[in-house]
Amino acid sequence: MIDCKIIRVFPRRTAWTPESPLVFIGDPPLFRPPEMPVKISVTFTWDIPEGQRLQRAWEQYYSDVQIGGPAFGDPGNDFTPGRFIKEGVTFTSRGCPNNCPWCFVPEREGKIRELEITNGWIVQDNNLLACSNYHIRKVFEMLMAQNKAVTFSGGLEARRLKSWHIELFKKIKVPELWFACDTPASLKYLKRANDLLGDFPTRKKRCYVMIGYKENLASAERRLKNVYALGFLPFSQLYQPKTKRIKYSQEWRDLNRHWSRPALYREKPRTKGE
């Protein structure tokens, strides 16, 4: 159950921001709730200065104002649905057993940790398929009871995909399955995943493709084309480090724009079902 007696403040509104009379974006309003704890949640490191400014602003009216969130290395020890993220989102695990050099999840959250399963239909786990078989099956039992279309927005690791996972996917409503291909070495696992997903149309097979990490423009474009050729819809994302943001050239931005919009790169109209 959501603790209704906490004011939650965010530096900016995103698609994940919860809706509540006690959720605020930015400075304290003219008409404010009565005295209660205030928690300022900062997701991105570049928003830390704004979060700290907001802490000072809210401290003018409330005695207990705390600041935290992913930007401050919060390991996510527990998860309360709807408190700091919108209704429907659930985390059933934290962390990741991989050690990808561009990813801050293992440093912040540690290795994979299974949490108590809470209801939801937007699964935001960083690496659900790295969990135990028992946990994965229990997650799908929960999802089957939701009677809603399920999104695995945290992504699925192609290397860990197995045939019995596919059977579980077929038991729920899945508009799309999200994978990732952040290096050329990942392509072989994506090909194997595509073979396992033979009954799923192209429009349901989607792939985050991080570009710009220790590679040139030609290499990034080649990987994007390969992902598409394997039967997935690539969605390009420019790499950004944890702290200082990279200012990419127009060429990089154009490449990213083209390959993050299927309407721009799809070569021809697909047949029905694709």
Listing of model-derived features with the role each one plays in the protein:
Residues M1-D64:
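A short, structured N-terminal alpha-helical element that caps or precedes a catalytic domain
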Residues M1-R12, T80-E109, T118-D125, L129-A130:
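N-terminal pre-triad scaffold of radical SAM enzymes
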Residues R8, K39-T45, F104-A193, R203-Y213, ...:
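Core AdoMet radical
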Residues W16-E19, P29-E35, A71-T80, R113-N119:
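Short loop/helix-cap segments at secondary-structure boundaries that form the rim of catalytic
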Residues V23-L30, L161-F169, L190, L217-R223:
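Short, acidic/polar
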Residues W58-V65, K148, P201-R203, F232:
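A short helix->loop->beta-strand "cap" motif at the edges of active sites that frequently abuts
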Residues Y61-P75:
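Short beta-strand elements of ligand-binding domains
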Residues K171, E176-W178, A185-E274:
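A structural motif corresponding to the C-terminal lobe/cap of the Radical SAM core domain
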